[in-house]
Amino acid sequence: MDIKRTVLWVIFFMSAVMLFDNWQRDHGRPSMFFPSATQTKTAAPAAPGSSTTASQPTDLPQTTAAAPGSTTPAAQQAQLVSFSTDVYRGQIDTRGGTLSKLTLVKPGEGKQPDQVITLFDHTADHTYLARTGLLGGDFPNHTDVFTPVAGQATDMTGNTLTLSFQSPEKGGLKVVKTYTFTRGSYVINVDTKIQNVGTAPVKPTAYMELVRDSQPVETPRFSHTFIGPAVYTEQHHFQKLTFGDIDKNKQDYATSADNGWVAMVQHYFASAWIPQQGAKRDIYVEKIDPSLYRVGVKQPLQTIAPGQTIDVSARLFAGPEEERMLEGIAPGLELVKDYGWVTIIAKPLFWLLEKIHGYVGNWGWAIVLLTLLIKAVFFPLSAASYKSMARMKEITPRMQALRERFKSDPQKMNAALMELYKTEKVNPFGGCLPVVIQIPVFISLYWVLLSSVEMRGAPWILWIHDLSQQDPYFILPVLMAVSMFVQTKLNPTPPDPVQAKMMMFMPIAFSVMFFFFPAGLVLYYVVNNVLSIAQQYYITRMMGQKKKAA
């Protein structure tokens, strides 16, 4: 019995350590077990004009526009153009025609009206911008003041809203930057018309970048997730880059491609520049200020003859990490919702959760039904585990007698215990395998509920108005503690007094920790525990009836 209990404790602590290690890596800290790929992989030769070092994009303008409230003369020349659509409230800074503020007013179904999220912002305390410009000469870029096209509407009344900004002539080029917002969409079409008004041909390079500081996003305690840049290409797939690796110049990513996208990722939300498929581009990631970072692409353009105008089009995604929506926008974009090493299990679980929600219309009840379905699927394994535990509980008095009898001779005690197991046809490890098989599923569901923006603002019943926030009255954590206490009473009492005290202390320790977990996660664990208690009680009772009948 001690061997089995020790194995189960080892499994439990290994699972806890693996969860914590995954949390560490997602929160930008090094793994406890595996060195970062950037520490072991030798960087491939850089493509022309690109490198994996932090000093890579030296030809990019380093200036960041002054935050609102600055009194510098340059800042006074610019203005903020406010706009609104059905999903956004925002501002475009005429300095660079930069999207400097973007508030999501409809971040998903079932959200409360006051639960808006400001994604892009530019204040004294926080910077997060989407900007573009031209390289290769003294051409218009994000440091120049653009002029809004006169007479354009700034509030969406139809299915689209178009805002255009014109640059001054610079280096023989004029630029007209146009943002097109579509009703119900989190994808912004950004079209740049480049006109050569000079007398000589020019060959500029366009850049598109996301700039933000390392300020953490507010999330429930114990629920921190990855914040930082990400790069996706068909050749190298999804690559996350932590701010810490960028600080140490150890970032590892694809530096050139003709596909993919670059993004800034945070809990529940992301932004991404998606250039035209097939357009060659160099990718860069760098630190530009003590706490300011950028990720972007540089796209070489064709030679523009005098009098010629060319178009450069790209899409800018800025919105919630809703898997189905992301899959329809660009290949691989759904990976910004990162499940880590459990993706292969987590994605089908979310698909199933989403299907259940489609029928019941409530994410809380969807969690309950999914947990019930998982327990039903694993019932044969759980039954085997509970039967083994019940048999072990029956022979516990005899085991304790053998331990007392041979306590001075461990070898004889182990031999006697093994003989008892053989005689009673009990496998001390019989309950371990079913538990091990189920652990990856439970961990995967943990990450599904933690990562899904659909939980944000989603109510369940009565006092639970937001499954992504902690229970305001701690009712679910208390119920979880009670359910864990009941489970300890159903299990065999450990012969070791220290183990017995630990088993009694666990419900208290876990309930305190779960006070700060999102309500959706705690709901899952409560339902899982209640179903486990019901299964164990049923199986134990059936075994008792069979024994009496025999």
Swiss-Prot record:
Low complexity bias locations: 35-73
Gene Ontology biological-process entries: protein insertion into membrane; protein transport
Membrane topology: Multi-pass membrane protein
Chain positions covered by the region annotation Disordered: 34-73
A Pfam family recorded for this sequence: YidC_periplas
Positions of transmembrane segments: 3-23, 363-383, 429-449, 472-492, 503-523
Cell location: Cell inner membrane
GO MF annotations in UniProt: membrane insertase activity
Keyword list, A-Z: Cell inner membrane, Cell membrane, Chaperone, Membrane, Protein transport, Transmembrane, Transmembrane helix, Transport
Bridged cysteine pairs (disulfide): none
Key word Protein biosynthesis present: no
GO cellular component assignments: plasma membrane
Record-linked PANTHER family: CYTOCHROME C OXIDASE ASSEMBLY PROTEIN COX18, MITOCHONDRIAL (PTHR12428:SF65), OXA1 (PTHR12428)
Family according to the record: Belongs to the OXA1/ALB3/YidC family. Type 1 subfamily.
Function: Required for the insertion and/or proper folding and/or complex formation of integral membrane proteins into the membrane. Involved in integration of membrane proteins that insert both dependently and independently of the Sec translocase complex, as well as at least some lipoproteins. Aids folding of multispanning membrane proteins.
Subunit structure: Interacts with the Sec translocase complex via SecD. Specifically interacts with transmembrane segments of nascent integral membrane proteins during membrane integration.
Descriptive protein name: Membrane protein insertase YidC
Gene: yidC
